Amino acid sequence: MPPKLDPSQIVDVYVRVTGGEVGAASSLAPKIGPLGLAPKKIGEDIAKETAKEWKGLRVTVKLTVQNRQAKVTVVPSAAALVIKALKEPERDRKKVKNIKHNGNISFDDVIEIAKIMRPRSIAKELSGTVKEILGTCVSVGCTVDGKDPKDLQEEINSGDIDIPNE
C-alpha cells in the first residue's frame, strides 16, 4: 500500500481538458481520487473555470490541492493563446477535426503572447520566445500582419525587426 497522504501537504496535479466541457470523471479519478477529492465535483469546477475564456480550446489545468480543497488555475499553451488571439467563432469539436486556422494576428499580439509564455520558455531573450510563438503560428496555420511567420523569423534573425527586451 502506498503511504497515506498528509492533508496539509500541497499537491499540484496537471490535467488536459477542453474548455467549458465537463471531462469524464473516470479520467480524473486516478489522479485526484487518492487525494480524497470527488472527481465529478472537480470536473464541474474545471468546466466552470474554463467556460468563459477558453470555451472549445484544449488547455492544461493546474489543480492545487491542499486540505482536500482544490484550486483550479488555467495554464494555457502557446497554441491556445494564438487561437484565442485569432478570435474565431467556436466550432463543434466533435464534428470538425484537425482544424487549420487561416486567420491573421498582429505582431503586437505575438509579442503579448510571448510575454505571457516567457516564464515557461527555454529561450534566453524575449526575441527567442517571440520566435517560438511564430513557430506555433506556423503550426496553427495563421499569418502575422499578413506575412508568413517563417519570413518574420528570418527578419528577426537578420536584425530587420527589433524586439525590445522585456
Swiss-Prot record:
It holds the Pfam family Ribosomal_L11_N. HAMAP family: Ribosomal_uL11. It comes from the Eukaryota. The lineage of its organism: Eukaryota, Viridiplantae, Streptophyta, Embryophyta, Tracheophyta. It comes from Arabidopsis thaliana. InterPro entries: Ribosomal_uL11, Ribosomal_uL11_C, Ribosomal_uL11_C_sf, Ribosomal_uL11_CS, Ribosomal_uL11_N, Ribosomal_uL11_N_sf. Keywords: Ribonucleoprotein, Ribosomal protein, RNA-binding, rRNA-binding. One of its GO terms (cellular component) is cytosolic large ribosomal subunit. This is Large ribosomal subunit protein uL11x. Belongs to the universal ribosomal protein uL11 family. Binds directly to 26S ribosomal RNA. One of its GO terms (molecular function) is rRNA binding. One of its GO terms (biological process) is translation.
